[in-house]
């Protein structure tokens, strides 16, 4: 909501908590109708893609939500953004600096825990193969989001870029792993 207010695009999402677990089937129907499959299911407070799953149907959605709830009592369900995975390191306090944009070429369907730490076949290309104008836009958006959310020190800002060049902020990691 804060990022939307500042014209920073993000995937559409819904959050569910342990409190509203009694009516999951109804929520699943509403969420699938609004966001459409495939969906990404994430525990709110985990890192390294732990507990994140892609759901292509209701059965996978239920399994993914149960997995996410095993890690946290709040779960985010996001629409799938088909595009390239990009990342930017942002460092500083009052006048933060953004690094070059890097691109993650995941060896799996998405950059999950296995793609980061187990399989070792994912690639990180720095700088990403994007034009200078898009590089500037992404770096400026990363700094803007960093400031808007009150980040300090060091963060990694993750993005998706669609085939037509639309950029969506995926998340800000305030304890980034900077995995290769």
Can you annotate each of these PLM segments?
Residues 10, 98, 154-155:
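A short coil-to-beta-strand element that immediately follows conserved catalytic motifs
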Residues 79, 89-90, 146-178:
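Conserved metal-phosphate-binding beta-hairpin within the catalytic cores
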Residues 19, 49, 86, 165, ...:
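Active-site-proximal flexible loops/turns
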Residues 56-137, 161-168:
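Phosphate-binding site of ATP-dependent enzymes
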Residues 123-124, 134-155:
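Internal helical hairpin/lid segments
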């Amino acid at each position: 909501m804060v990022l939307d207010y500042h014209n920073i695009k993000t995937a559409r999402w819904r959050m569910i908590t342990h409190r509203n677990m009694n009516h999951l089937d109804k929520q699943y129907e509403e969420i699938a109708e609004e966001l459409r499959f495939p969906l990404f299911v994430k525990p709110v407070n985990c890192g390294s893609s732990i507990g994140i799953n892609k759901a292509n149907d209701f059965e996978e959605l239920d399994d993914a939500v149960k997995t996410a709830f095993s890690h946290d009592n709040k779960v985010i369900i996001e629409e799938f953004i088909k595009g390239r995975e990009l990342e930017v390191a942002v460092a500083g306090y009052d006048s933060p600096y953004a690094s070059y944009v890097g691109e993650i070429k995941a060896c799996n369907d998405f950059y999950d825990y296995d793609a980061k730490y187990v399989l070792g076949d994912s690639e990180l290309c720095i700088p990403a193969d994007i034009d200078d104008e898009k590089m500037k836009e992404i770096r400026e958006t990363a700094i803007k989001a960093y400031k808007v959310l009150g980040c300090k020190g060091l963060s990694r800002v993750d993005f998706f870029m669609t085939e037509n060049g639309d950029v969506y902020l995926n998340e800000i990691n305030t304890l980034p792993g900077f995995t290769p």
